[in-house]
Amino acid sequence: MEDVKLEFPSLPQCKDDAEEWTYPMRREMQEVLPGLFLGPYSSAMKSKLPILQKHGITHIICIRQNIEANFIKPNFQQLFRYLVLDIADNPVENIIRFFPMTKEFIDGSLQNGGKVLVHGNAGISRSAAFVIAYIMETFGMKYRDAFAYVQERRFCINPNAGFVHQLQEYEAIYLAKLTIQMMSPLQIERSLAVHSGTTGSVKRTHEEDDDFGNMQVATAQNG
């Protein structure tokens, strides 16, 4: 594939007067990026409506599994726009398939001056993984750097091992996707031609090896 230079926006840096993390803060939401908040379900409960409105929240991503639907629910559908994802906090759960729709949801909100809260149950594993994925793709970051950035703002995050593995895999996926999006039709055509030529060369090499092997067998039999 031809070299394509990808450009990403600068990552906002931590405020000098950032509040020092304390254990009770895990029950609250934190602003990870301007307009993007991460927190537990307790930060989106009915009793927290005044706080959500104070921070200007307009969109909420609610991450839960079916068995949690009775107590983790969209409480303000008449006030906020929701994206509800059915995802278990299980290492074998495929979360990569949801990354594109969550990025589109967050981007759409921020570009229109809105603010987004991403929450699961505890705000530690599932929701943290999605915020990390968003930051990786938006700012062109590796998993470990995006994790560290989010952890500076919400210290208690701890995506499960399966989610970590998928986030590490996602780096190559989003870079390839963005590279293709940046390429012109001519560049894509050239890249496909180069790939096809390489495949053809390999195929011809295998065929030549087979022909040579058959010739050796025939020679031995005739000898």
Curated annotation (Swiss-Prot):
InterPro entries noted in UniProt: Dual-sp_phosphatase_cat-dom, Prot-tyrosine_phosphatase-like, STYX-Interacting_Phosphatase, Tyr_Pase_dom, TYR_PHOSPHATASE_DUAL_dom
Modified residues (Phosphoserine): S184, S201
Annotated spans, Disordered: 199-223
Tissue specificity field: Widely expressed with highest levels in muscle, testis and brain. In testis, expression starts 13-14 days after birth and is limited to the seminiferous tubule and to round and elongating spermatids. Expression is low in condensing spermatids and pachytene spermatocytes, and absent in spermatogonia, spermatozoa and somatic Sertoli cells.
Motif Interaction with FBXW7 positions after renumbering to this chain: 76-78
Homology family: Belongs to the protein-tyrosine phosphatase family. Non-receptor class subfamily.
Subunit relationships: Interacts with MAPK1; independently of MAPK1 phosphorylation status. Interacts with CARHSP1/Crhsp-24. Interacts (via FQQ motif) with FBXW7 (via F-box domain); the interaction is direct and prevents FBXW7 interaction with SKP1, a component of the SCF(FBXW7) complex.
Name listed for the protein in its UniProt record: Serine/threonine/tyrosine-interacting protein
